[in-house]
């Protein structure tokens, strides 16, 4: 089957809940369902605007509040933290499929050797957590008057915590001021958590289902099997799902990228549907839609560079650029900073793609979204310093003045 590039993009956008078709409940339950549908939400430390995990969820539900994610992890146990492959929030219902990864880490020769070399420290760390309850790495700092170098030394203790977490012996009970709080896995897992080790075939089918459900359309390479499972088993599972008719292989017109795969049911729905209203999104660079940079270039002809690690003189787009998605294409980038003391969202630069010129309908939509994003970042106004092209700064500023005030669901604290 052959599909257009536009259809492929719409499949990807729909799977990510960015085309207005998701029907999620309001509040925390809607956030939990968003995590389940996305499969994972990547965690990141950069905080020039709301951190990536909060930003990603806000992009799907504008009534999202950061406290909702905390409750889903710390109280409701609907999500947990683990590697996917970076640190991520994951649906608790998928916990069992990560057990083989944990077991593989625990049984690796490198881990066994490290544990043998640090056996006393491991024992002391586990005993403290069992006795005192959930602890952060900072709780293992050396007490006043005690020399560093003993088991109280923070760095070795932190390494133990991270090793035991990767092995599945400890879990993150919650985050306090973004610091991980570790506890025994048996005390974090909810009573109804499924802890049965999946068979190789079960896990392979899970990997294919998660990839297609979250990506909408993907090549075998883009499914990321090598990071988590056996490539051969996943390839067999994919082949079986194609044979059963669940999955359809497609070629994308205009792309020399080999076969891609999509759910047959979704493919039929999107292929037979005319384009609806364009939705505009300001996305995190760690958003699930853009995190695979190679796929982003292939499917959307868009480059999303993270330049915060570059010297300032070598940055083309800015410290922490946010892609602008409008309809089924990426039309530009923003380099923002939330000054919460001044309650101002500063857009240091708004840049648009060289081949994009349809500014008249875009600017009002962008202005409205910027005001909502500002509210989400606890800011009351938006200031645009520069634009590329330069001629757009005045009309964008004018559009911001005319944009409707964001509702409380745009990220304002609720009481």
Describe every region a protein language model picked out.
Residues 1-415:
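Long, charged, low-complexity, helical-prone intrinsically disordered regions
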């Amino acid at each position: 089957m052959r599909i257009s590039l536009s259809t492929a993009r719409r499949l990807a956008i729909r799977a990510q809940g960015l085309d207005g078709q998701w029907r999620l409940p309001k509040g925390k339950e809607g956030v939990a369902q968003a995590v389940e549908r996305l499969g994972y939400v990547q965690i990141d430390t950069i905080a020039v605007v709301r951190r990536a995990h909060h930003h990603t969820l806000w992009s799907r539900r504008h009534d999202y509040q950061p406290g909702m994610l905390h409750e889903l992890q710390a109280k409701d146990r609907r999500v947990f933290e683990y590697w996917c492959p970076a640190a991520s929030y994951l649906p608790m219902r998928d916990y069992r499929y990560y057990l083989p990864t944990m077991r593989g880490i625990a049984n690796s020769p490198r881990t066994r050797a490290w544990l043998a070399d640090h056996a006393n420290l491991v024992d002391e760390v586990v005993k403290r957590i069992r006795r005192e309850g959930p602890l952060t790495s900072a709780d293992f700092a050396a007490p006043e008057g005690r020399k560093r170098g003993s088991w109280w030394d923070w760095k070795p203790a932190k390494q133990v915590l991270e090793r035991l977490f990767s092995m599945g012996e400890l879990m993150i009970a919650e985050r306090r001021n973004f610091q991980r709080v570790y506890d025994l896995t048996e005390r974090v897992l909810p009573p109804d958590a499924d802890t049965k080790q999946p068979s190789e075939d079960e896990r392979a089918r899970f990997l294919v289902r998660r990839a297609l459900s979250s990506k909408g359309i993907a090549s075998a390479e883009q499914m990321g099997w090598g990071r988590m499972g056996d490539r051969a088993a996943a390839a067999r599972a994919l082949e079986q799902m194609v044979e059963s008719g669940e999955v359809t292989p497609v070629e994308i017109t205009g792309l020399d990228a080999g076969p891609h795969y999509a759910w047959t049911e979704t493919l039929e729905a999107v292929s037979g549907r005319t384009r609806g209203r364009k939705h505009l999104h300001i996305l995190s660079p760690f958003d699930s839609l853009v995190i695979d940079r190679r796929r982003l270039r292939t499917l959307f002809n868009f480059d999303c560079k993270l330049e915060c690690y570059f010297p300032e003189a070598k940055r083309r787009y800015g410290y922490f650029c946010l892609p602008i998605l409008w309809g089924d294409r990426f039309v530009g980038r923003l380099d923002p900073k939330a000054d919460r003391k001044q309650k101002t969202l500063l857009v240091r630069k708004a840049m648009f793609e060289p081949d994009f010129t349809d500014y008249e309908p875009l600017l009002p939509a962008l202005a409205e979204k910027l005001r909502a994003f500002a509210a989400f970042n606890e800011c009351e106004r938006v200031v645009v310093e520069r634009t590329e092209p330069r001629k757009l700064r005045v009309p964008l500023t004018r559009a911001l003045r005319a944009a409707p005030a964001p509702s409380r669901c745009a990220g304002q604290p609720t009481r």
